[in-house]
Amino acid sequence: MNMNQTTSPALSQVETAIRAPAGNFAKYNYYSVFDIVRQTRKQFINANMSWPGSRGGKAWDLAMGQAQYIRCMFRENQLTRRVRGTLQQTPDNGTNLSSSAVGGIQGQAERRPDLATLMVVNDAINQQIPTLLPYHFPHDQVELSLLNTDVSLEDIISESSIDWPWFLSNSLTGDNSNYAMELASRLSPEQQTLPTEPDNSTATDLTSFYQTNLGLKTADYTPFEALNTFARQLAITVPPGGTVDCGYSACQPAV
């Protein structure tokens, strides 16, 4: 506050808000909003029954709001000064960094060539498309909840449901055997459909399909029964001890 001022600017705003004469707070030894909020609301009202009277509660509330705002601004300025001081102590060597990697960055025109033709409509702006398709929200939530554990969903069910023969021995089968193998695949229901749905291709020779989509010249799916081959051709990784087995002896992908 300026030494030549009797009332702070913040307190002057309170006077204006309650329609009090300018400088009236100073007559009662209130020179800033902090002089007011040093008292509780009740204490301030009781000490100033003669003035401002019924407006005492509103005056205290406004003063408290101004005081909180000033505190926030003060702390923000302090933090800004500290951050700037820290940055000044840390030299920026960005000009010395190699820019060789910049050439490998894909431009937006290459990453999203469809943007130029998109209409500015609600679906184009707000539609959320998962990065991994097909997407199954419940399965994704289960996988996320088990992400930091060494236990799979199959292990959890096998420990809690010993009535499933498959969990007791691979040679024992029952009504839930196929379901148990589906759990072991760690694929969502929609993902399991891809390798298990019937072939709807009218072509008798699928060599071109496998060569185009999976990079191997073969007439059927049998080379991909080997996990390493399947993962390598799809450029995917399998967690240690994991499997991408769909649980069926014939996992021919649909065309």
Curated annotation (Swiss-Prot):
Keywords: Plasmid, Virulence. Pfam families: VRP1 (PF03538). The keyword Repeat does not apply. Disruption phenotype: No effect on virulence in mice. The keyword Transferase does not apply. In Salmonella spp. the spv gene cluster is encoded on a highly transmissible plasmid. Part of a Salmonella virulence gene cluster. This is Virulence protein SpvA. The gene is spvA.
